[in-house]
Amino acid sequence: LNATRNVASIREGGAELAGPNFARALSLNLANNLREQMAVGSFGAAGIGLGQFQATGQIETYFGSRALYQKFLDGTDSALSVRLADSAGNALILDLPRLRFTDADVMASGPNEDVMARLSFEAIRHPTEGFAAAFHRFAA
């Protein structure tokens, strides 16, 4: 899968993320925070401790309007979904039904350069959906 042919849509807050705030980059980090539980008399780990799930990421968009940046300033929750599809019609949807922007940077590197917004986010467990992040797979 690649970002040119296979990203069918990026939705933020339920609406297509499009002009004037086109997405330029998106990253996602998932961590289960598992840990080894060592014990005397055991070769290797005696167990695996469960950790807290974390989903964080960053989205970079052209700064065509203040809409996303304003959500950061106001502390407003949002949502993000990314639909990936292959040429056969199979699809994978990354679903973050509730997230909060944790940091934002608006920058222009110089004259004749585009103004970009880089927003960091953290997914939060949705109260009715019951999850912070999910992958949904659909066969053609």
What are these regions (language model features)?
Residues L1-A140:
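Signature of extracytoplasmic/envelope-associated structural regions
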